[in-house]
């Protein structure tokens, strides 16, 4: 429903701008980077009681379903396509990254939010908005200090 009927999809043309990361703007435009689309999906799915977890792959954020013998991954940036563990490992290898098992595990809420903020730091820096960049960097530091896994 989110990707089909509602039309949410990856923001390929505006990947490096804050509007593809800020959830209010992603909801309005229905375009976002992987982590933003995953956050919207996670919020809706959890509200419905679905057992989904954030998965912080390097270069591509996904949603994981860790029920049963093998996890299943949802690639929100690719229209909600389901991926197997092997497919996700291949995606990592195709991007010159190690297929490390740790990459395939859920991440904490703090880690997810810190990653969102790091993206915004980079995006605001690229636009020359040092004030906003510094603001989101303070959020990163606060989140990293209080991560429940730290």
Q: Over which residues does each language-model region extend?
A:
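A structural boundary/capping signal
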Residues: 1-150
């Amino acid at each position: 429903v989110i990707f089909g009927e509602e039309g949410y999809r990856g923001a390929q043309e505006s990947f490096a701008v804050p509007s593809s990361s800020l959830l209010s703007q992603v909801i309005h435009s229905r375009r976002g980077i992987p982590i933003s689309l995953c956050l919207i999906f996670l919020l809706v799915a959890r509200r419905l009681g679905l057992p989904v977890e954030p998965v912080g792959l390097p270069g591509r954020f996904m949603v994981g379903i860790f029920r049963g013998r093998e996890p299943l991954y949802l690639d929100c940036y690719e229209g909600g396509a389901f991926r197997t563990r092997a497919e996700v490992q291949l995606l990592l290898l195709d991007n010159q990254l190690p297929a490390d098992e740790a990459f395939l595990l859920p991440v904490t809420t703090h880690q997810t939010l810190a990653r969102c903020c790091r993206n915004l730091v980079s995006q605001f820096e690229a636009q020359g908005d040092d004030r906003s960049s510094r603001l989101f960097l303070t959020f990163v530091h606060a989140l990293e200090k209080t991560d429940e896994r730290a």
